[in-house]
């Protein structure tokens, strides 16, 4: 089994965090089984790496259902949607990742498919067009998105359960790291687990990726147990800083201080200097900086906070 799948929980019992969401899913699944009907359509939304795909896989495991994986941005034409829906067996789960990326011009094809399990197709040339109705077996569509606002209201309304992935706690992250380190056969004490968790941005995918890199260094350095020295060597090498910030986060903070002297700066100006797309800045670079109150948004743009200045000062002294 590939390592990523081995680390990934395969049951609700092994899934850490999202307690209310998991309880709701278990009730929905149990109800659908008792009614002998397909599970209602589900939409998960939240930041990258927080378990949306894992939850979809667990739902499929519990239902003992086939799961078909699709990337939303690849659904560009009607034929793409038809290819996904063609030849599915009853109770199949169709998982569309980044569902907000579907071409909006073909979204309507999904409406009748989700509501009535049919697709109406126009056939023939102008003047002789006919509507052919194609029946589909009952299925469950599970969507995942990092950008809920980009999903149209009509499509959102077709989902019976829209679930937000809430923030993971430090305790959640400690348990996730403990479980994953056991799978990777890494020996470490609770202090080291907490230390690694502090670099994870409370994101399971980041925590697991850090563990795999620590494993690589420990293996090459013949370390029997994981200590702080091994962890720090790993993080220094891959450019992970205190509180889990990356090199690009540090460049962003330094830019606000060194180039713009702590003044507010427009997003487009920052994007131009960093040579990064504005959406990359908004969705990837800024969230941890805003969450940790290292920068703030003002009417004039972005500005570093006192916390942000103190953070950079601490980096210099370490």
Curated annotation (Swiss-Prot):
It is found in: Cytoplasm. Residues 1-168 are annotated as: Large ATPase domain (RuvB-L). It catalyses: ATP + H2O = ADP + phosphate + H(+). ATP binds at residues 7-8, 49, 52-54, 158, 168, 205. Disulfide bonds: none annotated. Mg(2+) binds at residue 53. Has 3 domains, the large (RuvB-L) and small ATPase (RuvB-S) domains and the C-terminal head (RuvB-H) domain. The head domain binds DNA, while the ATPase domains jointly bind ATP, ADP or are empty depending on the state of the subunit in the translocation cycle. During a single DNA translocation step the structure of each domain remains the same, but their relative positions change. This is Holliday junction branch migration complex subunit RuvB.
